Each structure stands twice: as C-alpha cells, then as structure tokens.
C-alpha cells in the first residue's frame, strides 16, 4: 500500500479519535486541583488585561510559561467567558493534533496502514482519552515535543527547532532538553554523530532561543529573582531532585501507569516492542530504534526523577503507538498465524480490567451498576478478541475490537461514571452552595489549599489559603480570633481537627466529602 493515507482513512480516523477525546468534555466540572489552576489563570489574564505575567488569586505566580494560558484565553473569549467546554477544548484539540501528526509520520516512515493503526492506537488509549479531556498543559507539550521528534525523523530540522521553541514556551527547558537528549542518544547508538553537521545545530538553537527566551527575559526584568527561584528552582530543578508527592517515590510507579494508560492495547505492547527488535529489517529497524530510544529515555528519566506525575508518561505515547501500529500492519500480513504473545497479553489485560471495573465500582455505591456494566462489557470484548486471535487468527478484526473497547470504556467513564462522582473530585457544587447560602459578612473565609484554585474559579473569591497538611498553617487558622468559615475536605478535617480545634467548628454543608465548616 502506498505511504499516502487516503482521505477517507484520515476522515475515519479523525471521527473516531475526535469522538473519543471530545465526548463529555463539558459534562464534568474541572477536577481539583490542576484543571482549575490553568482556567483561573486565563480568567485573570483577561480580567487584568495582562497576558505575559500569569496571576492567580489576583497575585503573580510563576508556574508555567504562557502558551497554554494564551490558548485558554482565546477559547474563553471565543465562547464568551468561562465554561468547562471553553476550558478543555484547547487541550483536546492539541491532543487530536498530536495523534494526527503521529498518524501522518508513521504512514510516511512505514506504510499507510501502519500510520492508520498508529493513530487509532494512540487515539483510543485510556491515557489520551483522559489527558485529552483535561485542561492542563500536558497535551500542548505533547503536541510540540512530538512535532520536534517527528521532524527529526523526517529531517525537517528547522521545523524541529521551531517546535522545540514552542515546547519551551509551554513547559520550560524540558521542551528542548528532552528532544535534544533523545536525538543525541540515537545518533550515539547508531554511530552517526556526523549527522549533527547537517542539522544546523548552532543556528537551530538560536532559533529555539529566539522563540522561547523573550518571555523569560521579560519575566526576569519585571519580577527579578522571585521568578528565577520559583520557576527554575522549584518547578524545574526541585521537581527532579525532591518529591512533590512523597508517597509516590517508588521506582515502579510508572509501570502501572503504562499498563493501564495503554489499555486496551497493553496486551500487544510487549510483543510489539520485542518484534520491533527481532522482526524489523533495513531502514525500518533504524526508525524503530529511534522510537525505542524515545520511550525508554522518557520512562527512565521520570523514573529517576523524585516527583512522579501520571501525566509525565504522555510524552512516550506517540513512540509506543507507532511501534504497535507498525506491528499490527506487519501481523496483518500473517493472517492465519496465531499471535500467541498477543493472545496471552489480551487475556491477562482484559481479565484484569474487567474484574477491576466490577470490584472498583463496588467501592463507591453510585458506581456499582456502571462499574458492573463496564466490567462485563470489557470481559465480553476480551472474549471476542480471543476468538478473533486464537480461533480465526484474524489480526485486523482483533485490532478493531480493541478500538471498540477504547470507545466503550470512554463512553461509560465520561458519560456515566464520572458525572456521578464528580462532586468527590471538584469543589464546584460546594462553591455554588456557599455562594447561594446566607452568610455572615463579618466572617473571614479560609479555603483548603487543594480546593482553592477551583473555589476561586467558580466563585471569584480567593479566600485565605489553609494548608491542611501543615500543622503550622492550621494552628494559624485556630489562633485567628475572627469568626470564620473554612472549606475543606472531610477526610482532612477528621485527620486534623485536633490541630485546628475541632470542638470550635460546626459542619454547615457536606457535598460528597467536600465541606463548609463554621467556627462556633
């Protein structure tokens, strides 16, 4: 098959992937704490008419460069103000763009069928389904970093540097460090460092700086060392050397992230990685080697880093998707041959996920029925996959059943399950309750640090931050002689109520574990 994807194939791909990513983005409140942070910052850019220095709670802060905020600002203005749809649409479109780039690149590097399947794999994973619906920076970084690395594969070096510059403007130095390290390791392993002479490295880095540096210079000139200490020190260096979440500091943390995040394709992942080494030849094997270095570097780097975030694994998704897509296309040429590795992997993963949905749903009463339905559907689809792979040895049928599994999982998760439990993970409802209630205007308001971005987003009231994990912070709340309210999570109140003088507080409202308390 020619390496040019037919228009019909691209349209079909965009319909499937677009549905998987866009469905339900306006049906669930923004989830605390990460999503509200970005939407609120964009709101404040508009409110203060200042688009270079980000603010939150009406004060400057130095968490991320501005590109994602600008995308949010454009979306909020387009839709006439804040809504869940306006806040999530930019991240969703960047995710779809990254899938499309991966598809086109794989088609040109391998074959049209390999490209088509690479896009379907990437676009129907649990990871892209979830992250593509989240109003956070990660899919924007994914778009630019994927663009940079794929441009290297296609020897489009000037475009590669341009993508790196935009990646730096999305999430900082990692935008050029990661592509640079992956490319260098690949050239080193293939003993082709001489290729760097054709890559215009020095002028290319100047282009990266021309795109990425002006904002940093502006921020330093206007905010001085506060910007350097917080952005470079805390949000970049410190996150590598010190854990943001101490309970996640395990070398194996990202293994379950990949296993669950690549579902429903996890069952064919190990086989594809192995086959890319043992069953590829010529230029194909060299291209696959680059993809192997890509995902291995990302996995090892973040496994070493002290701060662990699920979203960090998103950057390796294009590489693994292209490897799987290549292998699906290769295996379709072997129809009639039993793919034992895929059979075993599918049996294990579908069984685990099916049982997991059923058992997990029972942990929350509102999810019991939905979890049961999704669990049974997963087990049935797993059985059909085994039938296609084991009895009929039909690779393409099995692959399409995987696509169906991804879509069914997404529709159930975001059409049924998440709307039922959103109040457990979003302050939106309790914020509306606070705004509607009769309040004593003389009382001050404290807000749980975890909930504060969302509370500000949905009320425009910043409140006073209470770090409910800090005894010192809660003691300050206790010592404040004024009458007060505090919005915090129920389980944190029960854990820390002695530190904040629990006998002096009474519960006003409790919405799925997020509460308003009032001092007596």
Predicted regions and their residues:
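Membrane-integral, polyisoprenol-dependent glycosyltransferases
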Residues: 1-338, 360, 456, 505, ...
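Membrane-embedded architecture of ER/inner-membrane glycosylation machinery
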Residues: 2, 158, 272-520
């Amino acid at each position: 098959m020619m390496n040019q994807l037919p228009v019909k194939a691209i349209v079909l791909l965009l319909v499937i992937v677009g549905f998987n990513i866009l469905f339900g983005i306006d049906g669930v409140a923004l989830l605390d704490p990460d999503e509200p942070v970005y939407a609120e910052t964009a709101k404040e850019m508009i409110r203060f008419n200042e688009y270079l220095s980000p603010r939150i709670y009406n004060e400057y802060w130095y968490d991320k460069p501005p590109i994602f905020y600008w995308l949010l600002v454009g979306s909020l203005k387009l839709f006439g103000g804040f809504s869940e749809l306006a806040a999530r649409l930019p991240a969703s479109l960047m995710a779809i763009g990254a899938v499309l780039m991966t598809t086109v690149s794989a088609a040109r590097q391998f074959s049209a069928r390999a490209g088509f399947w690479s896009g379907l794999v990437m676009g129907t994973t649990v990871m892209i389904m979830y992250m593509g619906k989240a109003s956070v920076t990660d899919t924007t970084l994914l778009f630019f970093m994927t663009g940079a690395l794929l441009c290297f594969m296609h020897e489009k070096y000037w475009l590669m540097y341009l993508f790196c510059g935009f990646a730096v403007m999305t999430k900082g130095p990692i935008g050029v460090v990661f592509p640079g390290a992956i490319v260098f390791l690949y050239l080193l392993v293939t003993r082709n460092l001489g290729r760097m002479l054709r890559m215009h490295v020095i002028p290319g880095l100047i282009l990266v700086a021309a795109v990425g540096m002006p904002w940093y210079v502006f921020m330093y000139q206007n905010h001085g060392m506060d910007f350097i200490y917080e952005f470079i020190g805390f949000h970049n260096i410190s996150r590598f050397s010190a854990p943001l979440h101490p309970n996640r500091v395990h070398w194996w943390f990202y293994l379950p992230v990949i296993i669950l995040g690549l579902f429903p394709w996890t069952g064919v992942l190990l086989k594809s990685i192995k086959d890319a080494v043992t069953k590829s030849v010529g230029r194909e094997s060299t291209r696959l080697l680059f993809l192997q270095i890509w995902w291995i570097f990302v996995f090892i780097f973040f496994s070493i880093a002290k701060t662990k975030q699920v979203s960090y694994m998103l950057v390796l998704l294009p590489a693994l998707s292209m490897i799987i897509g290549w292998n699906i296309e290769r295996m379709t040429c072997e129809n009639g041959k039993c793919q034992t590795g895929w059979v075993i992997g599918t049996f294990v993963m579908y069984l685990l996920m099916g049982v997991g949905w059923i058992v997990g749903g029972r942990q929350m009463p509102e999810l019991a029925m939905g979890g049961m339905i999704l669990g049974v559907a997963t087990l049935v689809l797993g059985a059909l996959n085994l039938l296609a792979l084991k009895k009929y040895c039909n690779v393409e049928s099995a692959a399409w059943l995987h696509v169906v599994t991804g879509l069914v999982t997404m529709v159930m998760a975001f059409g049924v399950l998440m709307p039922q439990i959103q109040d457990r993970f979003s302050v939106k409802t309790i914020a509306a309750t606070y705004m509607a209630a009769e309040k004593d205007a003389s009382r001050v308001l404290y807000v749980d640090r975890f909930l504060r971005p969302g509370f500000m987003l949905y009320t425009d009231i910043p409140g006073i931050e209470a770090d409910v994990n800090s005894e010192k912070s809660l003691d300050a709340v206790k010592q404040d002689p004024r009458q007060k309210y505090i919005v915090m999570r129920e389980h944190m109140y029960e854990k820390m109520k002695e530190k904040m003088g629990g006998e002096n507080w009474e519960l006003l409202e409790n919405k799925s574990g997020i509460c308003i308390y009032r001092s007596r």
